Amino acid sequence: YQGVYPVKSNQDRFVVEDIVKFGSSFRFGLEAGSKPELLLAMSCLCKGNPEALLVCNGFKDAEYISLALLARKLALKHVIVLEQEEEVDMVIDISQKLSVRPVIGVRAKLRTKHSGHFGSTSGEKGKFGLTTTQVLRVVKKLQDSGMLDCLQLLHFHIGSQIPSTALLSDGVGEAAQIYSELVRLGARMKVVDFGGGLGIDYNGSKSGDSDLSVPYGLQEYAHVVNAIRFVCDRKSVKHPVICSESGRAIVSHHSILIFEAICLTAPATHNEPINIPFIMEGLSEDACADYWNLRDTAMRTGDGAFWFYADQWKQRCVEQFKEGTLGIEQLASVDGLCEWVLKAIGASDPVHTYNINLSVFTSIPDLWGIDQLFPIVPIHKLDQRPGARGILSDLTCDSDGKINKF
């Protein structure tokens, strides 16, 4: 096994350098998907293990390919992964001009597809990769150019946050068949790169039905080696080096954000005695009828109907207040009575607002932008059982600057 870290997951210099440093004994490499990422990866890997892989993915123009071939001259173990058929022509042409023998990989579009939020990049209609027909044409072009021995890696990607290991094993088995066929056609295959997809259990549910969780752990994920071994043994193909690009699994927990709860805003409560005759003085006939319905319901029916009439009465009173026919003191008493009704039937569910020294848009924009769920825990009073429901509200003027999903 030889993993690579996809730089796109977090391009922070210190994160990438630490991964190269601590992964050196494991020959752990980097994956780049653009020219800036490639330059960053080349710079960092010059200080890493010389056997570590530099996987070059993404859209490639002549400049990108020239940079990747330069990595070869720097003694980096680069692999140029073809994601579009026309890229093979540029690789052949530029490598001959620079007198560099490249290491080439192909990204295959598998039939295996998952239906989750991140599954759109997989399957025959996926965004990236070559179809079976295109792979065969690439093999033919490399053969005609005397460079078929340069083809050494097969790459595929089922999608991020793969929901089950059964789906992954199915895709790996399909890829192993393609790998074995490429060996049969004369390519000197060495590596199977099955991309990313190792999921993170963000919400702790261990469920395969949510985009925020997976029902497996690292050990179960590693069992996919069985699918590769089964195919290779059956076809008498030498076992490949297995490579993965698990960016989310490596860096999703790399940092911790600690913030202070400045103050607490508790739900408003009505402590004054409720004067029913005072309320009734200003009510319209319809509002009075709603009140008597509420009173009759309280004596003879269940909680559900009781709350229905209470809410209907409250809305009628609010409309009167908007029209100017009900005073603010009477409206406050109506709120107090409805609050008492909720408590009486056990439906009261007060939510506290904790004002936190934080800007959601600055520190955790993914929470707002893509509804990413972040594990949040207190750092004090851990010996006490939580007893209140709450919302975390930041100190900015943005109405979306709050955390209400946990």
Curated annotation (Swiss-Prot):
GO molecular function, one term: arginine decarboxylase activity
Domain of life according to the entry: Eukaryota
Catalytic activity reported: L-arginine + H(+) = agmatine + CO2
Matching Pfam families: Orn_Arg_deC_N
InterPro entries the UniProt entry points to: Ala_racemase/Decarboxylase_C, Arg_decrbxlase, De-COase2_N, De-COase2_pyr-phos_BS, Orn/DAP/Arg_de-COase, PLP-binding_barrel
Family named by the database record: Belongs to the Orn/Lys/Arg decarboxylase class-II family. SpeA subfamily.
Protein name: Arginine decarboxylase
Organism: Theobroma cacao (Cacao)
Gene name for this UniProt entry: SPE2
